UniProtKB/Swiss-Prot annotation:
Keywords, alphabetical: Cytoplasm, Secreted
Source taxonomy: Eukaryota, Metazoa, Chordata, Craniata, Vertebrata
Disulfide bonds: none
GO biological process: wound healing
Entry keyword Cell division: no
GO cellular component, one term: endoplasmic reticulum membrane
Tissue specificity remark: Found in lung alveolar cells type I and II, as well as alveolar macrophages (at protein level). Detected also in testis and kidney. Expressed by different tissues of the ocular system like cornea, conjuctiva, lacrimal gland, eyelid and efferent tear ducts (at protein level). From these tissues is secreted into the tear film (at protein level).
Subcellular location: Cytoplasm; Secreted
Role, per record: Putative surfactant protein. May be involved in wound healing and in the reduction of the surface tension at the ocular surface.
The protein, known as: Surfactant-associated protein 3
Domain of life of the organism encoding this protein: Eukaryota
Protein induction: By lipopolysaccharides (LPS). Down-regulated by cytokines IL1B; TNF and IL23. Up-regulated in tears from patients suffering from different forms of dry eye disease (DED).
Length: 94
């Protein structure tokens, strides 16, 4: 029974950490000119130093307290496909 309680505490701590990070991201987006975060979205691109290949994070705040991010990395493309692989993370801050 102690292991179950410990697991619960670990999961709770991880959720609280993600909620804190999502809240900080929401505040940063609002300070960066997102006057209406319900309909705004942006893409942040970082270039890898050696490969000069962009890794983009698409950020969307569809409603107050919710942040959607998608990590796009062009190196995951196959030769025959033209779309990037995306990993979606949805965070609820409320």
């Amino acid at each position: 029974m102690r292991a179950g309680f410990s697991d619960f505490q670990l999961i709770r701590d991880q959720v609280l950490f993600l909620q804190d990070q999502a809240q900080r991201l929401t505040e940063w987006l609002q300070l960066s000119g997102f006057e209406n975060p319900v309909s705004e979205s942006t893409t942040l691109c970082l270039r890898e130093r050696e490969k000069r290949i962009p890794t983009c994070v698409a950020v969307c705040v569809p409603s107050p307290g919710t942040v959607h991010t998608a990590l796009l990395h062009p190196t995951t493309l196959s030769q025959s496909r033209s779309s990037s692989e995306a990993k979606m993370l949805i965070i609820h801050t409320a």
